[in-house]
Amino acid sequence: MKTHTIGIIMNGVTGRMGTNQHLIRSVLAIRGQGGVRLANGDMILPDPILVGRNPDKVRALAEAHGVSRVAPSLEAALADPFNRIYFDAQTTDRRAAAVRQAIAAGKAIYCEKPTAADTATAAALYRECVAAGLKNGVVQDKLWLGGLRKLRALIDSGSFGRILSVRGEFGYWVFEGDKQPAQRPSWNYRKEDGGGIAIDMLCHWRYVIDNLFGKVAAISCLCATHVPERRDEQGRAYACTAEDAFYATMQTDQGLIVQFNSSWCTRVRRDDLLTLHVDGARGSAVAGLRDCWTQSAEDTPRAVWNPDIEQPIKFFDGWRKMPDDPSHDNAFKAQWELFLRHVVNDEPFPWTLLEGAKGVQLAEKGLESWRKRAWVEVGAIA
């Protein structure tokens, strides 16, 4: 048995998502389990090196989690041939320049979404990787969530019969930063800094819809900035220049209607922060982050409209919770393991930077639809 130790440059992981999901729950968790085992018994052991704009934060993060390697600069990390993978979790407006540095250094590229601030740049990054012969990928974590894996199994088994419609609801209340600290960074609400929920979340819904319900063909979208002023990390008031909610209707290439509401200004009264409600001729399902509930045509209650009496049907009681999958793992970690297998053992990895560009494209088309107050076609990326 051989161990393939592989250096991973992790840029911008001092933020909430980078620290928790990518460093702690993915790369360090993989190290903690001894690596990723290949079919021949060999192991892949990731060895992270941290880099970022704030050296003090980077060093503190490394010390807190036992990471021995910290780079003095991105250039120094890229110059070391031991580091074969470049991972980027910076803010969107900084991503393309750093990824291009990594491409020039011949590194495999793996990065968060949005992969760029616009479709042209996102597509160019993919083409540049291909031209350089470099393996590349984008984080599409929600495909490995427990609830969506169960939903995928229902679709594959034909449980729905003909799927009629899909409704997605995502969001929660993000505090304004005055009475309670905000749960999201202030740049999320400034368009000039790459913020906005459309560019953030439509990138996610593109790959979810494409992989479960058919390719997105058209979109009609309305955005809003419901909270006009918030307070930043220093407690200073600032004007919100980016949208904090969008309400989208999409059509797939199979003619399926998919509605998606996403908001940082909503109080949750549903099963989870994200729910996907799928209605089919033979049954329905509601999937959350971890769980999925189903109702067959035979178990569907006979609803009768009568507002003059208390509702006699307890609608939540008519749904069955699907059993958990014991093999389920953290969604980010699951995709990290696949990407490591791809880089070291050339195993398939279809979630390339082209898929990332498609997400950016849908966000741009959604914003275009909002400006035009019209349906906008979503075509192939040239």
Regions found by a protein language model. Give the residues of each.
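Short acidic low-complexity segments
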Residues: 69-81
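Short, well-ordered coil/turn residues at beta-beta hairpins
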Residues: 88-89, 252, 261, 280
